[in-house]
Curated annotation (Swiss-Prot):
Molecular function terms from GO: small ribosomal subunit rRNA binding; structural constituent of ribosome
UniProt keyword terms in alphabetical order: Ribonucleoprotein, Ribosomal protein, RNA-binding, rRNA-binding
GO BP: translation
InterPro entries found in the cross-reference section: Ribosomal_bS6 (IPR000529), Ribosomal_bS6_sf (IPR035980), Ribosomal_S6_plastid/chlpt (IPR020814), Transl_elong_EF1B/ribsomal_bS6 (IPR014717)
Record-level GO cellular component terms: cytosolic small ribosomal subunit
PANTHER family, per the entry: MITOCHONDRIAL 28S RIBOSOMAL PROTEIN S6, SMALL RIBOSOMAL SUBUNIT PROTEIN BS6M
Renumbered residue ranges of the record's region Disordered: 96-135
Acidic residues bias locations: 124-135
Disulfide-bond pairs as recorded: none
Protein's name in the database: Small ribosomal subunit protein bS6
Length: 135
């Protein structure tokens, strides 16, 4: 079996159906004995250029180990699904399991946002304590 990196873009109006699509596509690969090494749902993002007058799409990245036949079946499923705007399948030399730069940046943003929220809550608590002490 070979290793592949797969990216597909879904129509933004179909974003709520992405989890079902991911489940179906990973099922195609795993039923044929394939293995999913990395699966990242990047969410709705800006496109570099308009596709069918759309400026945003829902991005999904997968790194898999699968047979060529199952990857061909997956590409056919992409082709016949109108919600999939674009797809790209690239063969890679090995399994890629670490988080992509996009996922790392998203995790850092979420961590920074949660720490800012925590510090804001702590500031409110200390202000309330100071007010209570002043009374």
């Amino acid at each position: 079996m070979r290793h592949y990196e797969i990216v597909f873009l879904v129509h933004p109006d179909q974003s709520e159906q992405v989890p079902g699509m991911i489940e179906r596509y990973t099922g195609i690969l795993t039923q044929a004995g394939g293995q999913i090494h990395r699966l990242e749902d990047w969410g709705r993002r800006q496109l570099a250029y308009p596709i069918i007058e759309l400026h945003k799409a829902h991005y999904v990245l997968m790194n898999v180990e699968a047979t060529a036949e199952s990857v061909e079946e997956l590409e056919t499923a992409f082709r016949f699904n109108d919600a999939v705007l674009r797809s790209m399948v690239m063969r890679t030399k090995g399994a890629i399991t670490e988080a992509s730069p996009m996922a790392k940046a998203k995790d850092e943003r979420e961590a920074r946002r949660s720490s800012e929220e925590r510090s804001a809550v702590e500031a409110e608590v200390s202000e309330e304590a100071a007010e209570n002490a002043a009374e």
